[in-house]
């Protein structure tokens, strides 16, 4: 068979609309999906997609071993990396030395302006868990970022009269970090050689191609957050992509800096290896707490001894979460990079000062625990949390970071799966909360919203994933509720899901609660395999395939 030129656009199809109409900024999708940009992402896809698929297969082999009762281990093959005390990552970019408070949110125009106008140090703009990957969200997200870094977003909300423009006068503007979608995601609106393009490569490639050189001209660089990895070879894959991408644009290797989210159980056994794989490009590791909890439930779902109680009892102070944090901070600081803390998802409660004060105190305690543990910065989901979080970090970490603080802790293989929670209980309230959060988040996601306020918390896919997998594992193991003594069965949970979906749908025209309920019930009833991710489970419902775009008409 003749080899395909990796940069040719033969056998490439675009099935999403490539509009020439601006929405809330100056650029349009036609400025993003140019022929040269398309060639660039197609080259990366053709070069690396087979490796990506093999690594996803490897995840399933790990799951099969865990299902058979095996345990996770530190890898023998990479012992030499862990035990070598001498190697360190290259120094990070000067603009990333101080990351005390990071704000996160999807790349829609309003969120981008609000984030840049908040006096945080860094802003993670998110194509992943806080963004429903509709074609419009993804392509206009790229448009918005292109215009934001060039200071070309300026619009007025007609309904409120509020003007949205980034304020750059006399202040330090937050440094932007981009999170592409994870390795498990594809985008069905672009086909390469008959298969959907890797969503990770699409998100990374379009942003890097259009913006890397401009960012360098501003004294910045292309910075990324890398999500959902489960093996150090997945980090090696990112490193290989970074090297090729930089070579293609004639940018020095090591220019890109990337922070890896440690949000899966298997990769917590390979932290040294992840940093080593990305040592020229690393900006540290981050504790993705909710996804980590979800991954722990998912990977250990067939081991009854690891069933977790109601989600509100699974805090950062329980053994397996505490041990993962200690391990991450120790290894990051040993290798000379940042160890970032997790998300405070609280939303200020404007109409109840007493409840709001209690919520802010909980945030303060959470951030105090993080900074005293040794974290170099933390995440917030709402600008209203900035004063609370910042005051804690300024008081206890007056330096830009605390990488110099080395803690001598030894975490064993068993410590990372110590899911014993004294007095942990599974209750009707916990069941109901999981159903309510799961349904409401899934329904919003199906309508194109990936970041949803529920019960005074800003929920993204990670918290809904915890709900989904807890319901599944409680049903699978026929757990008895501690408060009622009733056994949790698929029939019982399905009935509750239907009742809650009906309640939620009342007075909400054009809602998608039935689709959400059906998806949730299929897994619980064993009619389908447990999906690796909610986003892959629901993705086909948001795909909007249109007429094939004439590629010769692109810029």
From Swiss-Prot:
Keyword Metal-binding recorded: no
EC top class named in words: transferase
GO biological process entries: glyoxylate cycle; tricarboxylic acid cycle
One cellular component (GO) term of this entry: peroxisomal matrix
Record keywords, A-Z: Glyoxylate bypass, Glyoxysome, Peroxisome, Transferase, Tricarboxylic acid cycle
GO molecular function, one term: malate synthase activity
Catalysed reaction, written as an equation: glyoxylate + acetyl-CoA + H2O = (S)-malate + CoA + H(+)
Protein name, UniProt field: Malate synthase, glyoxysomal
Gene from which the chain derives: MAS
